[in-house]
Curated annotation (Swiss-Prot):
Subunit structure of this chain's protein: Homodimer.
Protein name, UniProt field: Chaperone protein HtpG
SUPFAM superfamilies tied to this protein: ATPase domain of HSP90 chaperone/DNA topoisomerase II/histidine kinase, HSP90 C-terminal domain, Ribosomal protein S5 domain 2-like
Organism, as annotated: Orientia tsutsugamushi (strain Boryong) (Rickettsia tsutsugamushi)
Compositional bias (Basic and acidic residues): 483-499
Keyword NADP: no
Keywords carried by this UniProt record: ATP-binding, Chaperone, Cytoplasm, Nucleotide-binding, Stress response
Top-level taxon in the UniProt lineage: Bacteria
Length: 630
């Protein structure tokens, strides 16, 4: 039979140009697409042979082979699947966006659709060959038919079909003539790596045929996540984890589930037992891989998990996900949101279970990934309360990790707030003047030292109807709490319990003096309810930004300047008493002024806020040192 020439269907030139130059950003996926098509062909025949065994013609073991001829610049892929006749070649390869797999699915009943393992849903995967090849030849022989046909094209608007002889009983053989600029694909290491990366879990075995004719199976041809959990050992899970995550540690938790309903998908996810070095790198890729029917699609630009769970490793495999025409970039699909919501719920449930099961191990997890998980508190999602429930925080009173539920269980009568303080150093927070009065009344304070803590506390204000309140707020309601009497110790350390407070007149006079000396350097001066050992501290008005958060945002260039603060004073402290005494006696007023200015600068230092005039501060310190020496 002579060669017959055909024109591709309408607009084919534009579509081919799109496929070759625009549609696929990753050239190496041409082999993934061809292998997926070959796998489909094998699955089609496997299904049809159930009702017509003669189609197998005595060859029931399916396989895919890949070989190359470097000298002739050929890459050859062959399968022993269903094959195609002349009509199939015209329909499937002569028409862009017409997929034989899609048509096959349309012909199946609903029950049969659930059982088949066909991958291709679009008619352009085959044409990705032209990204790296300047000519493609296809020899195919359909199962149950005697005649073989050759289809060939350079991808320039025409294709050719002719009768031919085939040296195989059925299936399809594709030969790509590789363009000179893509010589890198004429390397058996490269070819094997592509197969291993994208098609490792396809059920049909894939063999690389060397120049000596020997076949070497490249893929594992087994997807662990498709098996029942009861059939998988811990060792098999560990081996899979190390392979999929490129990790050397053991997984701390394995989450293996199959979802059915609105969307069907399987997840096999792992929580590592150690933290990776790039966990907080802004360009870090997701380590959860998306598969469709056991074919690797991507681990980029797909929100299968929320960013605050980026410590997860593993795979998600679905047959329902909608891809755009290239299979490269996922469409904006509500199915992705459903998968993410389902996975998020499972992970939170699993973490809650682990927290109850072994607090010690959970604390190890928290030290590794707690800061990442708390990023979810910044997003204002419906999962905030669930996330807060599994969070751990360092307790100032108990000097250990506790949950918010544990904090609430130990609340004092009439206490309505959950108190916290943010900062960079745990030991510095423990000795902060801000928490003295609370601790002296046995009211606990949560010590928050992660950078993310400075952000989530601004958007997450409540937990179980209790207000999360910064201790740097001026309005700390601790007087009505049913607790032990607060102890105020001065710097004399004489062992005496000095709890007497100055009368109203003395306090008014003292505050007036501080305001006169400090002027607009502070927003206000107030008598403190929370200081017991320290003379002064800085606070902010109710509703204002936390002092430490403000400092962090200024360091990150998100704010330009510090806001005006309130200076709280402790009338029972020795220094404040001395200042008050000098005021009453109208003596040492110059020293008094120096003391007030120095106390303000000290409060700046404690909160990490820069001193406005460092040289003036040093001069004052030297002045007091000289007086002490003399």
């Amino acid at each position: 039979m002579s060669v017959e020439t055909y024109k591709f269907d309408a607009e084919v030139g534009k579509v081919l140009h799109l496929v070759i130059h625009t549609l696929y950003t990753n050239k190496k996926i041409f082999l993934r697409e061809l292998i997926s098509n070959a796998s489909d062909a094998c699955d089609k025949l496997r299904y049809l042979s159930q009702s017509n065994a003669e189609l197998l013609q005595g060859e029931s073991d399916f396989k895919i082979t890949v070989s190359m001829d470097k000298e002739k610049r050929y890459i050859i892929l062959q399968d022993n699947g269903i094959g195609m006749n002349k009509e199939d070649l015209t329909q499937n390869l002569g028409t862009i966006a017409s997929s034989g797999t899609q048509k096959f699915l349309e012909q199946l009943g609903n029950d049969a659709k659930k059982d088949n393992m066909l991958i291709g849903q679009f008619g352009v995967g085959f044409y990705s060959s032209y990204m790296v090849a300047d000519e493609v030849k296809v020899i195919s022989k359909k199962a149950g038919e005697a005649q073989a046909y050759q289809w060939s094209s350079k991808g320039e608007g025409e294709y050719y079909i002719e009768d031919c002889e085939a040296d195989f009983i059925r299936g399809t053989k594709i030969t790509l003539h590789i363009k000179p600029e893509y010589d890198n694909y004429l390397d058996h290491f490269q070819i094997k790596d592509i197969i291993k990366t994208y098609s490792d879990h396809i059920s049909v075995p894939i063999y690389y045929v060397g120049v000596d004719g020997k076949e070497q199976q490249v893929n594992s041809s087994s997807a662990l996540w498709t098996r029942s959990k009861s059939d998988i050992t811990d060792e098999q899970y560990e081996e899979f984890y190390r392979n999929i995550a490129y990790a050397i540690d053991k997984p701390w938790v394995t989450i293996h589930n199959k979802s059915e309903g609105v969307i069907e998908f399987t997840n096999l996810l792992f929580i590592p037992s150690s933290k990776t070095f790039d966990l907080f790198h802004p360009d870090r890729k997701s380590r959860v891989k998306l598969y469709i029917k056991k074919v690797f699609i991507t681990d980029e630009n797909v929100a299968l998990i929320p960013k605050y769970m980026r410590f997860l490793r593993g795979v998600v495999d679905s047959e329902d996900l909608s891809l755009n025409i290239s299979r490269e970039t996922l469409q904006h699909s509500p199915l992705i949101d459903k998968i993410q919501a389902s996975i998020t719920k499972r992970v939170i449930t699993e973490l809650e279970k682990q927290k109850t099961k072994d607090q010690g191990e959970y604390e190890t997890f928290w030290n590794n990934f707690g800061a990442v998980l708390k990023e979810g508190l910044c997003e204002g999602t419906a999962d905030v309360d669930k996330l807060l429930k599994i969070c751990l925080f360092r307790s100032a009173l108990q000097d250990k990790f506790i949950s918010l539920d544990e904090y609430i269980a130990n609340l004092k009568s009439e206490q309505k707030n959950i108190y916290y303080i943010t900062g960079d150093d745990l030991e510095a927070l423990k000795s902060s003047p801000q928490i003295e009065g609370l601790l002296s009344r046995n009211i606990d304070v949560l010590l928050l030292t992660d950078d993310v803590d400075k952000f989530w506390v601004m958007v997450t204000r409540k937990y179980n109807d209790y207000v999360l309140k910064s201790v740097t707020s001026a309005n700390i309601e601790i007087d009505n709490c049913d607790t032990k009497t607060a102890k105020s110790s001065d710097t004399n350390n004489d062992g005496k319990d000095d709890t007497s407070s100055s009368d109203d007149q003395n306090c008014e006079q003292l505050i007036k003096y501080f305001k006169e000396v400090l002027g607009d350097k502070v927003k206000s001066v107030e008598v403190s309810k929370k200081l017991t050992r320290s003379p002064v501290c800085l606070t902010v008005p109710e509703g204002s930004m936390d002092i430490r958060t403000e400092r962090f945002l200024i360091e990150q260039k998100q704010l330009s300047s510090h806001s005006s603060k309130i200076l709280e004073i402790n009338p029972n402290h020795t220094i404040i008493k001395k200042i008050n005494e000098n005021i009453k006696l109208n003596q040492n007023l110059d020293v008094n002024k120096q003391l007030v200015m120095t106390l303000l600068d000290q409060s700046y230092l404690i909160e990490g806020q820069p001193i406005p005039d460092l040289q003036d501060y040093c001069n004052r310190i030297n002045f007091f040192i000289e007086k002490s020496v003399n």
